[in-house]
From Swiss-Prot:
One of its GO terms (molecular function) is calcium ion binding. Ca(2+) 1 binds at residues 68, 70, 72, 79. It comes from the Eukaryota. Residues 55-90, 91-124, 122-157, 158-193 form the EF-hand domain. Residues 1-233, 309-331, 402-424, 502-513 are mitochondrial intermembrane. Keywords: Calcium, Membrane, Metal-binding, Mitochondrion, Mitochondrion inner membrane, Repeat, Transmembrane, Transmembrane helix, Transport. Pfam families: EF-hand_7, Mito_carr. Solcar repeats lie at residues 228-314, 322-407, 419-507. Calcium-dependent mitochondrial solute carrier. The lineage of its organism: Eukaryota, Metazoa, Chordata, Craniata, Vertebrata. It comes from Xenopus tropicalis. One of its GO terms (cellular component) is mitochondrial inner membrane. This is Calcium-binding mitochondrial carrier protein SCaMC-2.
Length: 513
């Protein structure tokens, strides 16, 4: 059988030191390196990448000159794209931007020689940590079983055949195992730190904000927690959610109006609903309730994250990440805790969305009037159906997403586990839609209970009585009032969230994808 051809040219693999950096001590050299290289390697004389000897510095300089296409003493994104292509290495524009951004210390848009060496050294250290985490047997080699086990720990199930396909893409000598040099050579000048990051390609709860923050939280590795990347992910996700919710707020308010006011006798259409809102309060009225909807993102995300981590400890898992069923249990309990903590804000959001012009001066005035007129209990109306809706929403969303993810990995992932933006958005959209469809009747009952006191002549009912009343007077279809605008906002919400999330990650220095 023909041996797989290396994806790295001899020039690229030749810049590396062949020291046993995983298990042994690095070489030392009598000949000192130049000042620029010495500065780059001061913290780690060998670094596993360059020993500091003249032959290695020469190879680095040759590689740098090869990538410096326009010969201006710096490697920009265009230089990197053209130079790597000449060497037989293909990277996406996003990957190239991340490489330059990660190494560009003076932020001039390009890498000089010292920055180039710094980037390679730092990246090599990350690759070494990942290699060690994958090498379960601690024998200096990675086999298919170790790949499968590592991904299983991260919630990604692949077959042995699939693991072997991934293995073959990196195995240069046909042994069906990967040693340190093969692993490092394959990932040279690639911004990801790689196979365990398959799970990062598939993280979606912080990316896809469709306005219903009931998703199971993402898993963060020990390294992400230690380096502070976890809070950067949360901030990026919160910012993405704020922009996404603001852009789709008119559809969200229309959904609330249709849930509360639409009936057989008042068959409100989408066009009629928008016309009614604009006629009553002008264009700005389309965004009523959006302020509180955005504000509640921060406390809810923070509480959910802390509660999720605590639930993991209570469950007692000794794994760094949980299995699917454990994630569902821990995520659902964390969702209950977070929703219980911020539920009064949910009631305020509904009341603000339903308010008439001049009814309230703002969120605080709304809260004050509800408290004086209806008492504290008003802030927890609809609490029970809201809590009951968490499990079907989160469970179905997670199950559908995991099913689609693993189906894609089994069928299409060969040398790369990166699904691409389209697959990510499609999986997130489909899973979120299924979750909402299952929990929508509970969401509608919750909204009507929250709005009862603000609707003239509306009866005060318990959850079960309201269910029976809706089915009796409107039929089963009545439990799905407002579903059309709710589904219409999913695709734009997911798309906007993803774009903003990716840009905020780069701004915050998150280089995990």
């Amino acid at each position: 059988m023909a041996r797989p051809r290396s994806l790295v040219s001899p020039l690229l693999s030749g810049v590396f030191c062949q020291c046993d950096t995983v298990g042994g001590a690095p070489h030392t050299h009598d000949t000192p390196a130049s000042p620029s290289l010495a500065a780059a390697l001061a913290a780690d004389p060998c670094g596993g990448l360059v020993c500091g000897g003249p032959e290695h510095e020469t190879r680095l300089q040759i590689l740098f000159q090869e990538l410096d296409v326009n010969k201006d003493g710096g490697i920009c994104i265009n230089d990197l794209a053209v130079g790597l292509k000449r060497l037989g290495v293909h990277r996406t524009e996003l990957e190239l931007r991340k490489i330059v951004k990660a190494g560009d210390k003076d932020q001039d848009g390009q890498l000089d020689f010292e920055e180039f060496v710094h980037y390679l050294r730092d990246h090599e250290k990350k690759l070494r940590l990942v290699f060690k985490s994958l090498d379960k047997k601690n024998d200096g080699r990675i086999d298919a079983q170790e790949i499968m086990q590592s991904l299983r720990d991260l919630g990604v199930n692949i077959s042995e055949q699939q693991a072997e396909k991934i293995l073959k893409s990196m195995d240069k000598n046909g042994t069906m195992t990967i040693d340190w040099n093969e692993w490092r050579d394959y990932h040279l000048l690639h911004p990801a730190e790689n196979i365990p990051e398959i799970i990062l390609y598939w993280k979606h709860s912080t990316i896809f904000d469709v306005g219903e923050n009931l998703l199971v939280p993402d898993e963060f590795t020990v390294e992400e927690k230690q380096t502070g990347m976890w809070w950067r992910h949360l901030v990026a996700g919160g910012g993405a959610g704020a922009v996404s919710r603001t852009c789709t707020a008119p559809l969200d308010r229309l959904k609330v109006l249709m849930q509360v006011h639409a009936s057989r006798s008042n068959n409100m259409s989408m066009l009629g609903g928008f016309t009614q809102m604009i006629r009553e309060g002008g264009i700005r009225s389309l965004w009523r309730g959006n302020g509180i909807n955005v504000i509640k993102i921060a406390p809810e995300s923070a509480i959910k994250f802390m509660a999720y981590e605590q639930m993991k400890r209570i469950i007692g898992s000794d794994q760094e990440t949980l299995g699917i069923h454990e994630r569902l249990v821990a995520g659902s309990l964390a969702g209950v805790i977070a929703q219980s903590s911020i539920y009064p804000m949910e009631v305020l959001k509904t009341r603000m969305a339903l308010r008439k012009t001049g009814q309230y001066q703002g969120m605080l005035d709304c809260g004050k009037k509800i408290l004086l007129k209806e008492g504290v209990s008003a802030f927890y109306k609809g609490y029970v159906p809201n809590m009951l809706g968490i499990i079907p929403y989160a469970g179905i969303d997670l199950a559908v997403y995991e099913t689609l993810k693993n189906a894609w990995l089994q069928r299409y992932a060969t040398s790369s586990a990166d699904p691409g933006v389209f697959v990510l958005l499609a999986c997130g959209t489909i899973s979120s839609t299924c979750g909402q469809l299952a929990s929508y009747p509970l969401a509608l009952v919750r909204t009507r209970m929250q709005a009862e006191a603000s609707v003239e002549g509306a009866p005060q009912m318990t959850m079960s009585k309201l269910f029976k009343h809706i089915v009796k007077t409107e039929g089963a279809f009545g439990l799905y009032r407002g579903l059309a605008p709710n589904f219409m906002k999913v695709i734009p919400a997911v798309s906007i969230s993803y774009v903003v999330y990716e840009n905020l990650k780069l701004t915050l220095g998150v280089q995990s994808r």
